[in-house]
Regions:
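N-terminal helix-turn-helix
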Residues: 1-2
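Periplasmic-binding protein-like
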Residues: 21, 71-80, 142-146, 183-191, ...
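Flexible loop/hinge segments that line or gate small-molecule binding clefts
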Residues: 78-122, 219-229
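Amphipathic helical "hinge" segments at domain boundaries
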Residues: 7-66, 70-71
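Short, well-structured alpha-helical segments in soluble
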Residues: 59-73, 89, 175-182
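Hydrophobic alpha-helical segments within soluble ligand-binding/sensing domains
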Residues: 82-83, 105-142, 195, 235-254
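Flexible loop/turn connectors
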Residues: 181-183, 193-269
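Hinge/beta->alpha junction and helix N-cap segments in small-molecule ligand-binding domains
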Residues: 25-29, 51-58, 115-129, 143-181, ...
């Protein structure tokens, strides 16, 4: 220091920077779309620490431990394979002014916080209504819904309601191990790895996709435009989901907002 001079340090230098803790349950093509849209909308002035907890509550809890106070916002995609009640209780105890949930609305979490979500039951009903003219060329609709998964059971409720309303034969499969592929059937798949297996088995059975067998895949990704001249998809607008979550963070918004569902009809149906 220089004798006779007094230095003043602005309080602004000690203000906590705006930091976000971002927790995804897993990595996938559509999660990348959410991430890219979210971070692009936030811009370079916001710091984001990104973690993946692999649908595992123990890992989720470990990541959160001692970190809450360091962040301005905690943004979570809340899907778990196990210990759902413990996970929801932990989330419910987070400061609500910091909490932003993405992709899923959870009734067990109360208070004034922010959610950007999919309305699973209404979305599947809306999508199948949009595709009803194409579906009328088939008599049976089967959904591949893995028995051990984080997918919302409300998807099943909406699917079954639609099939019953329009008198389609329907079935819920946990996997494709013992499946007999017959003409007149439409398959709805949720998991990306099941889509590869499904297409391979249909082709091996020498059935034509788009006429004898229909395929509908959850979650639009760029590659689905190209597979078999185009796979029909039903999907949340993931870019909008990421952008909306970022806007809610930047504006310190509260409330629950459902993201529109989109149907992209292609040659597989």
């Amino acid at each position: 220091s220089v004798p006779g001079k007094v230095y003043f340090v602005s309080n602004a230098e000690f203000e906590q920077p705006f930091k976000i803790l971002l927790l995804f349950n897993k990595l996938s093509d559509h999660k990348k779309i959410i991430y890219d849209a979210f971070t692009a909308k936030l811009g370079n002035d916001v710091s984001v620490d990104f973690y993946v907890y692999n649908n595992n509550f123990s890992l989720f809890r470990k990541i959160l431990e001692d970190k809450v106070d360091r962040y301005s916002k905690i943004v979570i995609i809340p899907h778990f394979f196990n210990e759902h009640e413990s996970a929801y209780a932990l989330i419910n105890n987070l400061p609500k002014e910091k909490l932003v949930l993405v992709d899923k609305l959870i009734p067990e979490i109360s208070g004034n916080f922010c959610t950007v979500y999919e309305d699973f039951e209404k979305d599947i009903q809306y999508a199948l209504e949009e595709l009803r003219e194409r579906l009328s060329n088939y008599h049976t609709i089967k959904m591949i819904f893995p028995s051990k998964s984080y997918y919302s059971k409300k998807i099943l409720s909406g699917f079954i309601d639609f099939c019953q309303q329009y008198a389609f034969n329907y079935e819920v499969l946990s996997d494709l191990k013992n499946e007999r592929f017959l003409p007149g059937t439409v398959y709805i798949n949720l998991r990306e790895d099941h889509l590869v297996e499904l297409v391979e088995k249909i082709v091996n059975n020498k059935l034509k996709i788009g006429s004898e067998i229909g395929v509908i895949s959850y979650n639009e990704t760029p590659i689905k435009k190209l597979i078999l001249s185009g796979i029909t998809t039903i999907s949340t607008n993931f870019a909008m989901m990421g952008e909306t979550a970022a806007n809610m963070v930047l504006n310190n918004s509260k409330g629950h907002l459902a993201i529109p569902f989109k149907v992209t009809a292609r040659n597989s149906l």
